């Protein structure tokens, strides 16, 4: 079991939560990015640098993730592909994507893309709040408890 991080867009504060969690859980954590990343020394944490380009990091995460893994991403199509492979997917605001919710999120994403393409300003997400960080940590812990229960 591995935690995969779409690291180019992942907020630093979320990475810090993940570093601590990887140590505590003794779980491999792989940060995939198209640039060099500084991570704390750990036998559980590593980086995987990929070539720059559209969806290169996403495609690498999809290629390597397996059923039971966790993918941290705000990218809806990446989350959908991870779920299709049997992995769990969580965004940096603590929202866990599920097979039931991912279709709705994909539809909304496509709708917003259409609005932007037609020149309508849709704005971006609010900045990450303390509540978001707490929700992320809580959902990560919930996932970890599910993993432990499934191991028996």
UniProtKB/Swiss-Prot annotation:
* InterPro entries in the cross-refs: UPF0178
Membrane-crossing ranges are: none
Superkingdom field: Bacteria
Q: Name one Pfam family in it.
A: DUF188
| PANTHER family recorded | UPF0178 PROTEIN YAII
User: What's the family?
Assistant: Belongs to the UPF0178 family.
Q: What is this protein called?
A: UPF0178 protein YaiI
